[in-house]
């Protein structure tokens, strides 16, 4: 799922209703700006695999509120 494909009102809805925590917020915001997981991992000083794991959690939360 590409978060950047959602409209701005949809992204705002996810921010308000998905209850993202800590790194999930960071990953969500950067994915909304089309930043790759590799770049996100580097920026947050975490491994790529951990960034991918957080991204999966973000996707699951988005699917729950859809």
Question: Locations of the language-model features?
Answer:
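Short helix-coil-helix linker/hinge
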Residues: 17-24
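Short alpha-helical "recognition helix" segments of helix-turn-helix
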Residues: 39-44
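Short, Lys/Arg-enriched N-terminal segment that forms or immediately precedes the first helix
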Residues: 2-17, 50
């Amino acid at each position: 799922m590409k978060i950047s494909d959602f409209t701005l009102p949809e992204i705002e809805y996810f921010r308000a209703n998905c209850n993202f925590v800590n790194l999930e917020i960071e990953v969500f915001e950067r994915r909304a700006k089309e930043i790759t997981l590799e770049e996100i991992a580097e920026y947050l000083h975490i491994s790529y695999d951990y960034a991918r794991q957080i991204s999966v959690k973000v996707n699951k939360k988005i699917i729950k509120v859809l």
